[in-house]
Each structure stands twice: as C-alpha cells, then as structure tokens.
Amino acid sequence: MTSVKDLGKRLKPILLESLERLPLHKPTLDILERRIHVADLPFMEEYVGILNEYEISKINSKVENESRALEKIVKKTHIVWNNDKFPNHLEKFKNHYMELLHHWPYEFHSDVLNMARPGTGSLIYLCLNNDDRFFNFYKSQINNKWFNSVDQYKLTDEQRVSIYNDIFKQIFFLKRHTTISEVNKNMVPIVEVPLKPIGCDIPACRIKNLFNKKVDYIWKLLSLSSPAISLSHEKIIMNILEDTKDNRRINRLYRRSLKNSYVFDDTNPIEITYRYASFLQ
C-alpha cells in the first residue's frame, strides 16, 4: 500500500515540471515550488485538481476556463498557500480548538421567543443586524453542558473572551463587506439551538453536533475560504502587480484573482483592525 509520503515523492517531480507550463509571474511560481517541495498531500491534491482544469481547458482551447483555472491558482497561492501568518487569535483558535468549542456562545430559539424585546436582547438578532452590542451580551452564554468538562482548561475566562472577541470582530467585518467573501450578511457565528416541530428543544446529541458543525465552519471560513492577508504579504502582491503593469493580460489576471483580498493589521498590540487590500484601489 502506497504511503502518503511515497505518494508525495512520486507527485513532486510531476508537479515541479508543471510549473514550466504556467504563464504566471516568477514570485508566484517560486511560492508554488516551495510548497511542492514540502510534499504536503492536501495541498498537492488541491493543486492537482486545479492544474487538471487548466490542462484540459488548454487542450480543448477553452480560453475562458483556462483563465478561470489560472485565477484559482493565483488566488490559492497568494491568499491561502502562502499566507502562513495567521492573526494571533487564529493561532490561538488552532491551538485551543477543543477548549473554545466547549465554550462557544449559543442561544436557544425558545429563549428568543420568550423575550419581550428580542431585537435588543437576542444574540441572534444582534448578529443579524451587525450590532456591536452583541460583544457585550454573548459572554453570558459561553458555558455549555453538552461536552465533557476538561479538568484543567489552559485558558482563563478572560483569555477565551479575548479570543472570541477577535474571532467575531473578523466575522463582523466580513458580514459588513460581503463583496470580499462568501459570507452571507445574515450569517450568525454563534450556535443557534432550534426547536422541534412540536415546540420543545432538540435533544442533547443534536445540540452537540450543532456546536461541532458551527465551530468547524468558522475555522474553515477564517483560515481557508476567506482568510485575511498580512501586511507583509500585501506588499508582495503589490510588488507583483507593479512588476506586471506592462503585461496587461497577466496584470488583469492577478487583479481578478485577488479582487476579494482584505488585510489584517496587528501593529497595534491592543486592537487588530481589518481593511480592503491597498492593491484593490
């Protein structure tokens, strides 16, 4: 049976050779070459899939599909595969994933129905309205009973709240700027616990699954599908666009590929901020 390591070794020379056929700027090809040498199988599988799209489109003279495949490679290379620096809260999210899962904020639909003014008191409603009062209220809903408690959690309550604040702040930015991500403006980052059709709460096993799915979705959203890029990587992309300004076809390809980019700025130790990438202007 072929091991993952052996498969990576077999794919490596094939993928390295493929770089010679990609009409992309050298820094992009250099990044891809470094990633291929790491022999990261999930990366290779994803890259091979997009590469096949490109090769088939080229053989069939499907220019539009060929360009679309190249855009995918550029976007993945510069937004995901080479975006190794996570914001600090995402590093903590990764390192303390299970602990944060066990304390993830939630709200029962039954509680919302019993509120006199859900528009101002419900976490779900505050999320839907991108209301910053959400940050004052969710802290009372971070202890749940659907997971076995760990004797020694590594984070204090204050540390967990700090991480949640930064996670939800990034999500609120995406919800307010839906043109740069796949996030729906009505997305709610907390766990919503619905009612059964007969009006009672769903069973504990289903509630636990809701937590698992929600936290997995949030992690993949912020780390894979819509990650923020660092200030240093923003400069790399700006240099590429400057270098390719005399090649209109390639320059436009890069601009289309990176049109949804946003940047995190963590130079202020007190507060992280987000903005559109400068090269979008």
Swiss-Prot record:
Record has Metal-binding as a keyword: no
Protein name: Genetic interactor of prohibitin 5, mitochondrial
InterPro entries recorded: Gep5
One Gene Ontology biological process: mitochondrial genome maintenance
Organism: Vanderwaltozyma polyspora (strain ATCC 22028 / DSM 70294 / BCRC 21397 / CBS 2163 / NBRC 10782 / NRRL Y-8283 / UCD 57-17) (Kluyveromyces polysporus)
Entry GO terms, CC: mitochondrion
Keyword tags: Mitochondrion
Function: Essential for respiratory growth and required for maintenance of mtDNA. Required for cell survival in the absence of prohibitins.
Main location: mitochondrion
Subcellular location: Mitochondrion
Mitochondrion listed as a keyword: yes
Recorded name of the encoding gene: GEP5
Similarity annotation: Belongs to the GEP5 family.
